[in-house]
Amino acid sequence: SSAAEGGEKIVKVALTCDTGTIDDESFNQACWTAVSGYMGDDCQYYIPEADASDEDRETMIRQAVNDGAEVIVCVGYLYGASLAWAAEQYPDVKFVAIDVTQGDIGTDEIPSNCYCITFKEEQAGYLAGYAIAKDGKTKLGFLGGMAVPAVIRYGYGFVQGADAAAQELG
């Protein structure tokens, strides 16, 4: 850390992705835009190789810590097992886990130096399904891309929302 002009401490922040890159025009890019927009030049990112393993994710975390990161933003549920290891290995580092649940981490409690941010994808899906059915569409489908937990939850919500609207419409 270095001192800013008002004597304020600058915290070094790093962002790591479980898959993909920071210019994917999707989830990773949105996270990087937020972190770099807030931190300016005081942040770094670490991108996995294709088909990264838990060991590869641990290596990225280790590299971020070795580069001086005090806060590491870990993007993606695949970080679960790696966060369990990292939180114990680096108790003075704070971890912000995006789209990671306690179940993904696999511990009885979320580690005290880890903050998990999750989304309620099923609610957005419900609203989309409800709206499209209320708009009079009767032949609906859902193409979610990859069968990952967040997309599956969105799909469940979509079906439930469309069904609720259909029930109301008779």
Language model: regions and residue ranges:
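A residue-level marker of the well-folded mature domains of exported/periplasmic proteins
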Residues: 2-170
